[in-house]
C-alpha cells in the first residue's frame, strides 16, 4: 500500500520528469514480496518525459539479517540482473554511467554508485568526462546517488545534481551527524553555478522507522533562461 500511495502522490504533481536517485532495492532481490505486483504499481507512474533512475549502494546483491546487510566484498560486481529486468518491465529507464538528450532540450545523466558500481563498470566516468561531449548551451542534469564530488561536477558544467543516500540521518541523532559527513546532507545547496538537491527519500534502511526526520517525495520546479 505504501508503494501505491507513493505512486499516487507522484502522479498528483503532474510531473514532466520523474527521477529515482538510487537505493531502489534493499540489497536482496529475494526480499521483494511480490515483484510482479511491484512492477504493476511502478508502471503507474506517469510523466511527460518518462521515469529515469540510477543505482545506489544498496542496489547490490547482499544477504540481509535483522534489517542490516553483510557479505559484500569490496570490488565485487554483484548486481542481480533481475533488478535490471524489473525496472525495464516497470518502464523505468536505468542510466548506468550514461546520459540522454531529452526533447532536444536538456541532458539527463545517471551515475553508478561510486563504491559499488555494479556489473561491467570498473570505474565510473569522471565529472569532466560526463560533460565533455555535451552541448554546454543546453541544461545538464545529473542523478548521482551519493552527494559527493559537488565541486568537480560544478566545474564540469553540470547545472543540477540530484542525490539521495543520506536518508537525512533517518533517526535522531543520526540527522545531526550527517552535517559532519556531507557538504549537503539534505535539502538544497548552491555550489558554484550548480544546484545540488539531496532528498531524504521515500524509504528506509535497517529499522522500519524514522525519528526526527521525514520521508519525502521531492517536487522540483526548474526553469532555465537563455544566457
Where would I find each of the regions flagged by the language model?
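Soluble catalytic domains of enzymes that build or remodel membrane lipids, polysaccharides, and related
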Residues: 1-227
Amino acid at each position: 500500500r505504501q508503494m501505491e500511495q507513493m505512486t499516487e502522490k507522484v502522479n498528483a504533481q503532474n510531473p514532466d520528469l520523474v527521477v529515482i536517485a538510487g537505493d531502489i532495492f534493499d540489497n536482496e532481490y529475494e526480499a521483494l514480496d511480490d515483484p510482479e505486483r511491484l512492477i504493476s504499481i511502478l508502471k503507474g507512474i506517469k510523466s511527460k518525459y518518462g521515469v529515469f533512475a540510477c543505482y545506489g549502494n544498496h542496489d547490490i546483491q547482499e544477504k540481509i539479517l535483522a534489517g542490516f546487510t553483510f557479505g559484500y566484498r569490496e570490488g565485487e560486481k554483484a548486481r542481480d540482473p533481475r533488478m535490471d529486468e524489473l525496472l525495464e518491465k516497470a518502464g523505468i529507464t536505468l542510466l548506468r554511467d550514461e546520459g540522454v538528450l531529452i526533447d532536444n532540450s536538456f541532458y539527463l545523466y545517471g551515475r553508478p554508485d561510486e563504491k559499488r558500481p555494479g556489473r561491467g563498470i570498473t570505474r565510473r566516468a569522471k565529472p569532466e568526462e560526463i560533460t565533455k561531449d555535451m552541448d554546454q548551451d543546453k541544461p545538464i542534469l545529473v542523478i548521482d546517488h551519493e552527494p559527493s564530488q559537488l565541486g568537480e561536477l560544478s566545474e564540469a558544467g553540470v547545472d543540477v545534481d540530484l542525490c539521495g543516500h543520506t536518508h537525512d540521518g533517518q533517526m535522531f541523532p543520526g540527522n545531526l551527524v550527517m552535517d559532519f559527513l556531507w557538504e549537503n546532507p539534505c535539502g538544497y545547496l548552491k555550489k558554484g553555478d550548480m544546484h545540488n538537491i539531496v532528498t531524504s527519500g521515500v524509504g528506509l534502511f535497517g529499522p522500519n522507522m524514522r525519528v526526527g526526520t521525514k520521508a519525502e517525495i521531492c517536487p522540483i520546479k526548474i526553469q532555465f533562461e537563455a544566457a
